Structures are given as C-alpha cells and as structure tokens.
C-alpha cells in the first residue's frame, strides 16, 4: 500500500514521494543519500511566509493552546515539513563565507549506530515516509529543525556538506516509523493520535493528514533524555568533580556575560525596545538576526552591533574561571553560544563559538573576509560597511560579521568537534544558558548519560535532569566554587567572603509582613469557571474602586500590579457577562459604580484584571531575596539557591516555582517543586504509549494499533516529551539561552 501511495503522489508531481521511494530501494546498511533540493515553500507554509527561524514542530504544538491559533499550527506544520532537512553545517573556520563554499566529506556507514533490527526499521521508515509523502532522511534526529539554524537552500550547500547533528546525537530506536506506517495501513486519523499526545492542543481543520503525520513523527523522534545520577547531589560533589575531572565540557550562554555590562536585549528598556522606535517595521527581535530581513534592511543589526562590538567590555569571573581550567589542562572544550568574543579576551584557547562572532566579517557576495577592526569605523559611525572589492552599485555587497543568523548554518567544526568530544568528556557544566536553541540544546542528552552534569544558571531547566543545580547569579556561584577549590582558583575570587549554607527557607521580611497585615481582610470569592479553584482576594470596596479608577483612566494595559503577575492572563478576551455572573460582591456601593452600560462593562473587565493580578502579587516572590548577604539555601536533594536565582515561593504553602515553569518546560514539570524535593518529569507520551500497550494486550485489539511489534519503543519515547518548548521565545545568537 505504501508503494501505491508513493506512486500516486509521484504521479501527482510530488518530488518527495520519488525521493522516499529511492530511499526505500537503497541497501539497508548504507546511509541514506541526501535528497535533491526542492524549491518552494514547505508543507503548511504559504509562499509569502518566511522560511527562516521556525521552531520545531512539537514546540509549535505546545505553543498552540486549546484555542490554538491557526497561524501557530501552520508554523508547526511548516517545521514538520522541513524536518527532514540536514541539520546545520557551515563553513569551516577560516573560510569565512557566511554559509556557502562549504566542504563536504562522504559519511561512512559506520557513523551510525547499529541497533538490532536496524535494517528492518529503515525499510519500514522508508515505506512510512513514502506513504505520507515524506522525504528520505527523516529517519535521523538531525532532521529536526534547530530554531532556524538549518541548512541553506543553495545547490552549492547541498553538494558540499554532510556534517550535522546526526554525527553526534543518539539515534532513535525502532518504533515511530513502523507505528506510523501501520496506522496508515489501517486508516487511523492522525488527529486522534495527536489528541493523545497533546491533549490540550487542537490542530486547525485546514491541515491535511500528511502534515499531521509528519508532526506525529517529529514528536516521537525526540532523542531520549538523560536521567539524573543518584550518587551526585551536593556542592561538595561538584567541587570534587571539578578537582578530579580532566576533560570538562563547559557550555556557556548569555548568563556569563551579564556582569560585563553588555546591554540587555529584551527588557523594557533593552536594545530591541529602542530599535523598535527607530525601525517600526521590525516585526520582532528575531527579525534582526534573520538573514532575509538583513538583506532587505541591515541598519537595525548594525545599530545593535555598535552596542556590543568587541573592545568595549572585559571578561567576567566566569570567563576567567574557564580560562584557568583551560590553562590547567582540565578543559576539553568551551562551547559558547555568545558572540561577544570575551572568551578570546579571557585567554580561553579551547573555544568553539557555536553561533559565530564579531571577530571577522565577510562580504555577502564575493566572500571577501576582513578582521573586525576593518569595519569598526563604519559600524561606530553607523554606516553600513561595504565590500571594497565588489561594484559600488551592488546592493548586497555588505560586509556582514560572521554571526550565524536565523536561516544560516552552524559552523561545520561544531558538529565535528561534538562527534569527537561526546566520547571523551568526563564532566559537563552548563553556565548561563537555558538551552532552548538547537542543536546546542541537544548536547546534554547526546553525551553518555553516566557523565556527571552540573547546571549553573539563574533558573532551573525542568526539561533536563542535572545532577547538581546551582541556581543564581553565575559570578556569585563561581566565586563560591573558587573559594572551595583553593589554589589558583582562590586568587580569582572577586568577593573574599565565603558563603554559609542554610537548609531552611528564611522567613518573609518583617516589613513585608506588616504591609500584608494592613490589607483588607474581607474575602471576595471569584469562580472563574466550573473547574477552576476559588480564589480569595481582599474585598474592601474603596481599595478595589481606587484600583479600578486608576486602571480605567490609565488603560488596563498600563496597570502595573507586579513584574511577573498576569503574564498569561488575557482580560480583553474575558466575557463581561460571565464576569458579572461569577463575581460575588457584598458591598452595594461597588455595584453602583458607573452610569452607562459601556462604563460598567469597562470597569467590570478592569476589576476582573485587578482581582486576578492581586493574588499573584502577594503570593509569589524570589526566595533569593530573603537570603542574607553571605547565605545560600540548600534544597534537597540537589538544588542550591544563591543570590539572583529566579526561583519563587508561594506564600501560602511555601512551594518553590521557576519563572520558566509552564512556558518552556514539559507538561510534567510546570508544577512547583517543593522545598523538600524537586518534582520529576512525568511524560504525557509515556501515558500515551502505556495506553497503546494496554490496548494491544486485549484479544480484540491485538495487532490493531500496530505498535506492539515495535519492542523497545516505550523506553525511548517515554523521554521524548521535551518537544513542548515555547514557540515564540526564540533567542538571538548571543543569548541562545
């Protein structure tokens, strides 16, 4: 049947079907040949839609909520359609060609893992790919998009590079492809599968079955996540590892450069906020680093470049710590996502800049390459630097710093280095990165799982399992580690005070307790819907009326209740009639506010906003703000909270929660981990597969799902839910965290 479907698609002019059938005809022990280039937009994407920087399909599924906008699903579908492309690969260091003229080496068949039953699964995968119109290299995890860092669409690139994340990421075992193939044979509706995988997500009706099956395959093809080692938990364990390990990989993000004075990018007064005033057509922060937008208007990027150009900043304590590890021969490699070149300033030799840097610039047309000093004058004078060798009337003869833009490739040496380093590393340390951008985000799951892993970051990463979590300002944590390591490391310390450990959460400050005691005690009960818990907030009519008047006069969008409150609330979408029915106000004076119907509706909506925001303001606070100057908090079994940690506490039940919870984490991790023990992930995909196994055990369902024959799938897919990351939170190259 798969052959018939593929032939039908081929007859209809589908090049993907022909590619899939060609893949199915290859010997099973040979790597799949790269597909020929196909021009035009991917499935699920209109011709006018940009193709650069699309998040993975599963991330798109997560971003689409129960009332999922069709645009988000179309973006997820576009990612699914592009998922079979080669993972990023760009010019080798020294070529400086911004993505063309790449070197290609043939890949040997033994580059791939030889799992038992591999040949049978490759044949099944090819048949499934043919049946749904999928192309030939979907089998490998390198097909998953990396938030825009995918292979260029030029023919030259297709001919010249094979380096990709498939060289070093674990390969999924048998399962998802046979599963999809057999469900295709029995005519299963892919929407029923997606409903089980993502129960709160509703795909728009206009998406066809082939696109939906592609999304299913992407979700099920995630590599297995590492599980925490139970024998490594404390900061003492971390210090011992730093003393004993000789081949340490340090993965750094924007957090290591915060203390250097580099301007913030996304804050209210950050770089993007200021650029948006000068360039109102800049749609979002991502566009500044989109290669297509750069070709149309490079001015926003060069205005940004002036603010972080090399030579203006000095390395942080984190940089110096890594440099000393390198000097002592303990550093295997520092993989940095930053573009500020502070690693070189600090003297780190074994450095790999995953997303390029400002160190060099090259022409978009002729690839002429220069040092950063050659274009410094133009950038600081806010003149777009031009290539001296190209004709003056060539509009694209621009000297672009060799930073990896969305829509460009990652350096080929990144993939080659990871292919070697993954088998050599004896300790992984992640500093100042939330690991949201691939393929760098795949590193913790791609090295041997027995290798210890330490996180040093402002917030926890619920989608990954680190052995020791040191949460807070990176320099504060590194300073404490240097004290404990002693010797040359102690000389790096910028703060001579060694911190003391506490194991009980400090009480709320007395000043704040007095403030809370003065709040009106009378409760106001709001039942948002039949399934939501009842909330209790102060009812005093004078307080509420004052806040309502303030919000009405200043516009509800300008009402500042707290920095973190009501982030996900959408009061403009709340039905006024429902608010009136569900708000039980005892004071008649509040009911009489407003004279006209429009005024009542507006004030009712604002009151709803105030009531929703008020509990959040009072309930959540950063635990680190309760710490004294020389303290850090130990939260068993493996979490430490230092100053600057973005870990919050509910005042009522003293439950810790992360600012990232619910936005960039798995569904099982968005509950607040308690003070006693952080919660573990509980995958919804695990429940999905458990249900399928139960079905296959029944006589009437035996063989019906087509999944029971895939033995070994559940172990892999149980850990595959890390696909549900935030679609819209795409970071720029120096903040790929």
Swiss-Prot record:
Disrupted gene: phenotype observed: High degree of embryonic and postnatal lethality. Decreased levels of histone H3 containing a trimethyl group at its lysine 9 position (H3K9me3) in regions of heterochromatin. Attenuates spermatogenesis but not oogenesis with reduced numbers of mature sperm and spermatogenic precursors. Mice develop an autoimmune-like condition with late onset diabetes insipidus. Prostatic intraepithelial neoplasia associated with reduced autophagy. Conditional knockout in POMC neurons leads to an increase of body weight compare to controls when animals are challenged with high-fat diet.
Residue(s) carrying Phosphoserine: 14, 25, 46, 151, 154, 164-165, 527, 649, 651, 737
Top EC class for this record: transferase
Modified residues (N-acetylalanine): 2
Induction of synthesis: By calorie restriction which induces endothelial nitric oxide synthase (eNOS) expression. Induced in liver by pyruvate during fasting. Expressed in a circadian manner in the liver with maximal and minimal levels reached at around Zeitgeber time (ZT) 16 and ZT4, respectively. Its deacetylase activity in the liver is also regulated in a circadian manner, with a peak at ZT15. Down-regulated by palmitate; palmitate down-regulation is mediated by the induction of miR-195 that directly targets SIRT1.
Catalytic activity reported: N(6)-acetyl-L-lysyl-[protein] + NAD(+) + H2O = 2''-O-acetyl-ADP-D-ribose + nicotinamide + L-lysyl-[protein]; N(6)-propanoyl-L-lysyl-[protein] + NAD(+) + H2O = 3''-O-propanoyl-ADP-D-ribose + nicotinamide + L-lysyl-[protein]; N(6)-(2E)-butenoyl-L-lysyl-[protein] + NAD(+) + H2O = 2''-O-(2E)-but-2-enoyl-ADP-D-ribose + nicotinamide + L-lysyl-[protein]; N(6)-[(S)-lactoyl]-L-lysyl-[protein] + NAD(+) + H2O = 2''-O-(S)-lactoyl-ADP-D-ribose + nicotinamide + L-lysyl-[protein]
Motif interval(s): Nuclear export signal: 138-145, 425-431
Gene3D superfamilies: SIR2/SIRT2 'Small Domain, TPP-binding domain
PANTHER family in the cross-refs: NAD-DEPENDENT PROTEIN DEACETYLASE SIRTUIN-1, NAD-DEPENDENT PROTEIN DEACYLASE SIRTUIN-5, MITOCHONDRIAL-RELATED
Name of the featured protein: NAD-dependent protein deacetylase sirtuin-1
Organism name: Mus musculus (Mouse)
Source species taxonomy: Eukaryota, Metazoa, Chordata, Craniata, Vertebrata
Gene: Sirt1
């Amino acid at each position: 049947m798969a052959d018939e479907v593929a032939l039908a698609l081929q007859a209809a002019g589908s090049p993907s079907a022909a590619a899939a059938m060609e893949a199915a005809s290859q010997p099973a022990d040979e790597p799949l040949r790269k597909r020929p280039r196909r021009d035009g937009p991917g499935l699920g994407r209109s011709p006018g839609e940009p193709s650069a920087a699309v998040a993975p399909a599963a991330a798109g599924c997560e971003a689409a909520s129960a009332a999922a906008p069709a645009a988000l699903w179309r973006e997820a579908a576009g990612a699914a359609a592009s998922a079979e492309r080669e993972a990023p690969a760009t010019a080798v260091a020294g070529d400086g060609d911004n993505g063309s003229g790449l070197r290609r080496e043939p890949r040997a068949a033994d580059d791939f893992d030889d799992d038992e039953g591999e040949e049978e699964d490759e044949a099944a995968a090819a048949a499934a790919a043919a049946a749904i119109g999928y192309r030939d290299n979907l089998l490998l995890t390198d097909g998953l998009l990396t938030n825009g860092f995918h292979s260029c669409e030029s023919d030259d690139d297709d001919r010249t590079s094979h380096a990709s994340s498939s060289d070093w990421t674990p390969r999924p075992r048998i399962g998802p492809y046979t599963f999809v193939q057999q469900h295709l044979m029995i005519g299963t509706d892919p929407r029923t599968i997606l409903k089980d995988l993502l129960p709160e997500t509703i795909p728009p009706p206009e998406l066809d079955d082939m696109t939906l099956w592609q999304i299913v395959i992407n979700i099920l093809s995630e590599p297995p996540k590492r599980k925490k080692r139970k024998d490594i938990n404390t900061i003492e364990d971390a210090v011992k590892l730093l003393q004993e390990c000789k081949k340490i990989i340090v993965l750094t993000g924007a957090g290591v450069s915060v203390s250097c004075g580099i301007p913030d990018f996304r804050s209210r007064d950050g770089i993007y906020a200021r650029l948006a005033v000068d360039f109102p057509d800049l749609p979002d922060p991502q566009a500044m680093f989109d290669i297509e937008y750069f070709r149309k208007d490079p001015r926003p990027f060069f205005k940004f470049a002036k603010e972080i150009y090399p030579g203006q900043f000095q390395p942080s304590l984190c940089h110096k710590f890594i440099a000393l590890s390198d000097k002592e021969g303990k550093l295997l490699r520092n993989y940095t996502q930053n573009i500020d070149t502070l690693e070189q300033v600090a003297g780190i030799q074994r450095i790999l800049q995953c997303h390029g840097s400002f160190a060099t610039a090259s022409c978009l047309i002729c690839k002429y390459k220069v040092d950063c000093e050659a274009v410094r004058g133009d950038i600081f004078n806010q003149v777009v630097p031009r290539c001296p060798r190209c004709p003056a009337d060539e509009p694209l003869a621009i000297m672009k710093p060799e930073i990896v833009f969305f829509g460009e490739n990652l350096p080929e040496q990144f993939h080659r280095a990871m292919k070697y380093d993954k088998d050599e590393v004896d300790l992984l340390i992640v500093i100042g990165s939330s690991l949201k951008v691939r393929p760098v985000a795949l590193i913790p799951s791609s090295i041997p799982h027995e290798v210890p892993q330490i996180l040093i970051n402002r917030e926890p990463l619920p989608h990954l399992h680190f052995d020791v979590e040191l949460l807070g300002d990176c320099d504060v944590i590194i300073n404490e580690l240097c004290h404990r390591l002693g010797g040359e490391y102690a000389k790096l310390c910028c703060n001579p005070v060694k911190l003391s450990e506490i194991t009980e959460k400090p009480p709320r400050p007395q000043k704040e307790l007095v403030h809370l005691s003065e709040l009106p005690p009378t409760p106001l009960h709001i039942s948002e819907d039949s399934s939501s818990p009842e909330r209790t907030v102060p009812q005093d009519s004078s307080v509420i009326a004052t806040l309502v008047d303030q919000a009405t006069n200043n516009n509800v969008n300008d009402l500042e209740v707290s920095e973190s409150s009501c982030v996900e609330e959408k009061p403009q979408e709340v039905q006024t009639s429902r608010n009136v029915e569900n708000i039980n106000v005892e004071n008649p004076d509040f009911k009489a506010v407003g004279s006209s119907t429009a005024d009542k509706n507006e004030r009712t909506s604002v009151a709803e906003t105030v009531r929703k925001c008020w509990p959040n303001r009072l309930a959540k606070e950063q635990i680190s703000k309760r710490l004294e100057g020389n303290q850090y908090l130990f939260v068993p079994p493996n979490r430490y909270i230092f100053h600057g940690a973005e870990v919050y506490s509910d005042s009522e039940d003293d439950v810790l929660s992360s600012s990232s919870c619910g936005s960039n984490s798995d569904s099982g991790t968005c509950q607040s981990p308690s003070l006693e023990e952080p919660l573990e992930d509980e995958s919804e995909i695990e429940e999905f597969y458990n249900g399928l196994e139960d079905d296959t055990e029944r006589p009437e369902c035996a063989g019906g799902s087509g999944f029971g024959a895939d033995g070994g799938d559940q172990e892999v897919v149980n850990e595959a839910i890390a696909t549900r990351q935030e679609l819209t939170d795409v970071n720029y190259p120096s903040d790929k965290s």
